[in-house]
C-alpha cells in the first residue's frame, strides 16, 4: 500500500486520488504492521509468557522500519506547522535548503521497490511451488480477489444503500490500492527477521504481483463502467 498502492492510485485517479490514498496509508500501514508483528509473535515458537512476551511484542513493533518512517514523517509535518505558527514561515526545508540531499533521497526512493523485487526474484524457486501450492493459491486468491471484492463491494453498498458514508470517485483509486495491491515486498523481509516462513512469503509476493496485473485491470474496468472511477 505504501509504495505500489500510491503509484497505482496516482495512475487511476491523479493527484486528488493520491491525497485520499495517502490518508488511508497513514492509518493502515502502521495498523497492518502492528497486526503482522502480533501474528508472527502469537504463532512463533517463542515460549515466553506474560510480561516478557508483551515486552517482546512492543519492542518489535517499536523497531519496525515502516512504523518508524510513518511517525517520523508525522513528526516532520508537525514541526513544519510549528515553524509556520512561530515564525510565520518555514525556516528550514529539506527540499529548499538541502536540495542535493532531497534529490538523492528521492532517487533512492524510486529504486527501493524494484530492487527489492529483484532480490526476491533471485531467491524465488519454482520447485517450491509444488510444496506450497495450496498456501499460494489460498493466499493469492484472498489477497487480490476476495479482499477487493469484499472491501470495494462494501464501499459501493454503503454509498448506494445508506446515507452514512458516501465514497466519491477520488476515493475508489485508494480503495483499489488498499484492497487490490499485491502482497507487500516488505512482508518477505519481515518473515525472515521474525523466524517465519520466508520462502512462502516470497512465493506470495511474486505470485500476487504477477496475478494482480490482471485483477487490478479487471477491477478498474468494472469500476469505470459503473461510473465509480473517472474514465
Show which residues each predicted segment covers.
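Alpha-helical transmembrane segments of multi-pass small-molecule/ion transporters
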Residues: 1-231
Amino acid at each position: 500500500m505504501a509504495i505500489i498502492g500510491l503509484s497505482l492510485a496516482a495512475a487511476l485517479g491523479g493527484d486528488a486520488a493520491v491525497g485520499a490514498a495517502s490518508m488511508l496509508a497513514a492509518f493502515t500501514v502502521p495498523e497492518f504492521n502492528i497486526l503482522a508483528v502480533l501474528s508472527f509473535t502469537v504463532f512463533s515458537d517463542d515460549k515466553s509468557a506474560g510480561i516478557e512476551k508483551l515486552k517482546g511484542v512492543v519492542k518489535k513493533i517499536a523497531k519496525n522500519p515502516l512504523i518508524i518512517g510513518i511517525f517520523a514523517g508525522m513528526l516532520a509535518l508537525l514541526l513544519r506547522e510549528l515553524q509556520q505558527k512561530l515564525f510565520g514561515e518555514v525556516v528550514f526545508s529539506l527540499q529548499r535548503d538541502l536540495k542535493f540531499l532531497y534529490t538523492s533521497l528521492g532517487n533512492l526512493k524510486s529504486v527501493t521497490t524494484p530492487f527489492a523485487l529483484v532480490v526476491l526474484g533471485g531467491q524465488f524457486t519454482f520447485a517450491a511451488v509444488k510444496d506450497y501450492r495450496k498456501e499460494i493459491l489460498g493466499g493469492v486468491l484472498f489477497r487480490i480477489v476476495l479482499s477487493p471484492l469484499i472491501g470495494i463491494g462494501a464501499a459501493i453498498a454503503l454509498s448506494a444503500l445508506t446515507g452514512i458514508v458516501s465514497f466519491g470517485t477520488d476515493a475508489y483509486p485508494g480503495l483499489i490500492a488498499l484492497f487490490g495491491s499485491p502482497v507487500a515486498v516488505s512482508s518477505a523481509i519481515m518473515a525472515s527477521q521474525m523466524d517465519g516462513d520466508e520462502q512462502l512469503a516470497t512465493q506470495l509476493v511474486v505470485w500476487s504481483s504477477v496475478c494482480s496485473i490482471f485483477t487490478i485491470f479487471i477491477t478498474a474496468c468494472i469500476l469505470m463502467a459503473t461510473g465509480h472511477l473517472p474514465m
